[in-house]
Amino acid sequence: MNVVVGFAELLTESKELAPEAKVEYGKMIQENAENLLKYVNSILELSRLESGKTKYKHEGCEVMSLCRKGVEFARQVGNGRLAIRLDTNIQSQMICTDENWFSTLLSSLLVPAENDKNSYNIVVRIRYDKEKGIVTFKIIGTPLAKSRFENKTTLIRHEINAHFIHAFGGIYKVQSDTHEGPLVIFTWPKTGD
């Protein structure tokens, strides 16, 4: 917030700044204001979750269809910077989840932040453990695990994701340093056949 206010004051009060500098400062103000807004919104979302004010829908959903849609969405918004491969032997699997929240979860794991200009090779590995009755998702190369400790907004997003998954009886684990690369693993209890 101090950066945004400081640059804004500099722009409005300084008559000595060149027009190019004012444009550059304007871009910095815009970027920092957007980051601040995302941070505040993430905090508010986490606060609603922790206070119990957010209620999830518990509905039967075909998870493979949700994953295919999530991968396709990420490819579209990734502007050619994302190579995503779905690695699974599951054709169809029902789980109990909130479809909108599950889509948001996938988006957070597959789509890099707007200011992240890196390219990513992501593998979405999905397996069903019949003995345990759980579906395991392993998102290898996820931008969210790469930037795990880079900013507070990312930490809050991990907390939001974990809260959602725990509400449905699953686990959520972030590993930023593995031989496969940064990854997130989460599990989901299976429902139906």
Regions found by a protein language model. Name each.
Residues 31-36:
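Short alpha-helical segment of the dimerization/phosphotransfer core of two-component systems
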Residues 37-55:
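Conserved E/DxxT/N motif and adjacent residues on the DHp alpha2 helix
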Residues 160-169:
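Conserved glycine-/histidine-rich ATP-lid loop and adjacent helix of the Bergerat-fold HATPase_c
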Residues 169-175:
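Glycine-rich ATP-binding loops of the HATPase_c
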